[in-house]
């Protein structure tokens, strides 16, 4: 029993352990709440930047296949077609979302795959026309461009065939040319008359082609240029800006909720006290004004009753002062109670004192004059 530690030391150790455990739990809880708050703010920042990018950035490039059709109800003995090849291309996604954005400049081109056949080489120049239309099929813009195959001499064609003969035999290469026709260099969408489709027509009945594609590429300037060419840098700056802004809002909200010292409420309480003081002052004036007619009537009754005045020879000046004392005591009592109703402010007490003195002065002089006239009579 001699080696046992003293009881106060055990109690002190237990108290210290409880305090440290409480602090540790509190710190863990605070760090957990802080970590969850940071994750939430970061997720909201990423979501806001993604929403802005999706709504602000248009489609960079749109490629649509062009399927030409022509009439076949004519004499088929000739090598030419019955009509010019025509194609109708829709400029909407899934029939709802439009490809073009308002105010954004676009470069519209038509890519033609033409074989190097003798017919196309003898064809020369031909015309390609595009007509953009809006709802209801109304044409809003038309553009025409001339096209022809690139010239290649017979010697150059023979050398090209010999060099790429193995690739041509196994189908890895073809004797064709890809022509890119620029239909619009700076096409802008009208917000009031949106473009819903385009009609493409090739003005040649003898043209031979493998396929065609309509390509729409956006030309970015300003902020869109930065977002498109530097996506990672802009994403980091945008998310960091959103996170900083949201963090400041959360910090001010926490300070207002916990401390309540950022925007003190003394101004509001001061306004309330001023209003209460004004209301109490008006009430005191109304009570004094109600009390004045009663004093005048009592004084007149003292003078006219039995034709005797308060200054009768049987009376003394001490009696006069004693008659005035009951009249002053209620007013002094009221003046002492009014400051208590106005939250104990000395301004209300001064106001009521001035009002009481101004109200008593005329009555005292009038009563003295009446007493003098009665005594002289």
Swiss-Prot record:
Biased composition (Polar residues): 292-302, 367-377
Top-rank lineage group of the source organism: Eukaryota
Modified residues (Phosphoserine): 289, 342, 345
One of the protein's GO biological processes: hair follicle development
Example of a GO MF term: phospholipid binding
Entry keywords, A to Z: Endoplasmic reticulum, Glycoprotein, Lipid degradation, Lipid droplet, Lipid metabolism, Membrane, Phosphoprotein, Transmembrane, Transmembrane helix
Glycosylation: residue positions: 88, 242
Gene Ontology CC annotations of this record: cytoplasm; cytosol; endoplasmic reticulum; endoplasmic reticulum membrane; lipid droplet
Biased composition (Low complexity): 349-361
Role: Plays a crucial role in the formation of lipid droplets (LDs) which are storage organelles at the center of lipid and energy homeostasis. In association with LDAF1, defines the sites of LD formation in the ER. Also required for growth and maturation of small nascent LDs into larger mature LDs. Mediates the formation and/or stabilization of endoplasmic reticulum-lipid droplets (ER-LD) contacts, facilitating protein and lipid delivery from the ER into growing LDs.
Family according to the record: Belongs to the seipin family.
Name of the protein: Seipin
